[in-house]
Amino acid sequence: MTMQVDPSANSSAASSAAPGTTVDRAEIEKFSKLSQEWWDPTGKMAPLHRINPLRLQFIRDAACRKFDRNARSLNCLAGLRLLDIGCGAGLLCEPFTRLGAQVIGVDPSASNIAAAKLHAEKAHLSIDYRCTTVEDMDVRERFDIILAMEVVEHVADVGLFLDRCAAMLKPGGMMAASTLNRNWKSFALGIVAAEYVLRWLPRGTHQWDKFVTPDELARHFERNGLGITEQSGVVYSPFGDRWSLSSDMDVNYMVVAEAVG
C-alpha cells in the first residue's frame, strides 16, 4: 500500500467555524465520536494517557512554585480555582481535584461532558463540568489557574481564544498551555508517524497548519500582558518506549504564562 501525505491535505481551509468564534464544529464532532474512549488507556486515547503524568507534573510543579506550595503535599493545590478548557472526559480534571483544587472543566462536546460526569461520579469526585465554550463563559468569573492543554491547535481563532482565557485569569494567576510546534519535523512525527505509521491517533486528528509555534504563542500571551515563565518539550524515545520532558520543543511542548510587570 502506498501512503501519501501532504501538509496541504491537513489544512484548516475547510474549517466549519463562523467568524468571530473560537469554535470549529468539525473539531467538536471529531472528538465527540471518541467520547466513550477517553478513559481507555489502551484505546484511541492511549497517547494522551501516556503523557498525562508529565502534563500533571509540569503544571503541578509550576503551580506550587507560583503559589508557594509544597508539591509533595497531597493537597498542594487546596483553595485554588482551576479552569480546564477543552477538558474532554476529565483526564486532568480528576487528578487536580485530588490535589485539592476547585476544578471547573468545560468542553463544547455534550458527549464528552457526559462521559466526564459519569467517570467523576464513579470516582466519587466533585467536579463542576459544563458543556460550553470559552467565549460563552461569564468573563466575571476568575481563576487562579487556567489550562488549555492540547487545545489551541483545534480552535478556530487562537488569538481570540487566548484573549478570552486571559480575561478570566485572576491577578497573580497562571495559565498553562500545550500544543504542537509547526515545522517539518512536527509534520513528520506529529502527523505522518503518529497518525499513519504508528497509528497512535486516528487519521485527521491534527491539521498541520493549525499547529502553533512557541513564538506565536508568546505573542498572543504578550498582547494580554502575560509572559512565558516556564516551558518544556515532551519527547518520545523508542528506546524504552517512554515519554519524557525535554528542552527539545520541535514537536510537542508545554508552557506556563504569568502576568508580567
Swiss-Prot record:
Record's keyword terms, sorted: Methyltransferase, S-adenosyl-L-methionine, Transferase, Ubiquinone biosynthesis
Pathway connected to this protein: Cofactor biosynthesis; ubiquinone biosynthesis
Keyword hit for S-adenosyl-L-methionine: yes
Residues given in the record as S-adenosyl-L-methionine binding sites: 55, 86, 107, 149
InterPro entries: SAM-dependent_MTases_sf, UbiG_MeTrfase
GO biological process: one example: methylation
Compositional bias annotation for Low complexity: 8-18
Listed Gene3D superfamilies: Vaccinia Virus protein VP39 (3.40.50.150)
Catalysis: reaction(s): a 3-demethylubiquinol + S-adenosyl-L-methionine = a ubiquinol + S-adenosyl-L-homocysteine + H(+); a 3-(all-trans-polyprenyl)benzene-1,2-diol + S-adenosyl-L-methionine = a 2-methoxy-6-(all-trans-polyprenyl)phenol + S-adenosyl-L-homocysteine + H(+)
A GO molecular-function annotation: 3-demethylubiquinol 3-O-methyltransferase activity
Disordered: region residues: 1-22
EC number per UniProt: 2.1.1.222, 2.1.1.64
Database matches in Pfam families: Methyltransf_23
Function: O-methyltransferase that catalyzes the 2 O-methylation steps in the ubiquinone biosynthetic pathway.
Family per record: Belongs to the methyltransferase superfamily. UbiG/COQ3 family.
Name the record gives this protein: Ubiquinone biosynthesis O-methyltransferase
Organism (species): Nitrobacter winogradskyi (strain ATCC 25391 / DSM 10237 / CIP 104748 / NCIMB 11846 / Nb-255)
Gene that encodes the chain: ubiG
